[in-house]
Amino acid sequence: MKLRPLHDRVVVRRVKEEEKTKGGIIIPDNAKEKPQEGIIVAVGNGAIGDDNERVPLDVKKGDRVLFGKWSGTEVKIDGEDLLIMKESDIMGILDK
């Protein structure tokens, strides 16, 4: 199944968090925080502005982004955990 978000929504896959600290201590699953960083896997076609014109999104598929701790709605598609959020929930794009 493929998910195509509508309007100004994006689908994000969280990046995997480190299993160990820099000092080599293994972090148990219940002590890990969910990463606030992810990769855009799909984008909507933009919101409709006040002038009834479509406003394109600033992010694109493949962008690595930062978002708020409580941003988005968690969904499971084909066994993969994803987030659906509005573009305004994204704080920034990480440049490579």
Curated annotation (Swiss-Prot):
Signal peptide: none annotated. SUPFAM superfamilies: GroES-like. GO terms for biological process: chaperone cofactor-dependent protein refolding. One of its GO terms (molecular function) is metal ion binding. Coiled coil: none annotated. InterPro entries: Chaperonin_GroES (IPR020818), Chaperonin_GroES_sf (IPR037124), Chaprnonin_Cpn10_CS (IPR018369), GroES-like_sf (IPR011032). Keywords: Chaperone, Cytoplasm. It is found in: Cytoplasm. GO terms for cellular component: cytoplasm. The keyword Chaperone applies. Belongs to the GroES chaperonin family. Together with the chaperonin GroEL, plays an essential role in assisting protein folding. The GroEL-GroES system forms a nano-cage that allows encapsulation of the non-native substrate proteins and provides a physical environment optimized to promote and accelerate protein folding. GroES binds to the apical surface of the GroEL ring, thereby capping the opening of the GroEL channel. Heptamer of 7 subunits arranged in a ring. Interacts with the chaperonin GroEL. This is Co-chaperonin GroES.
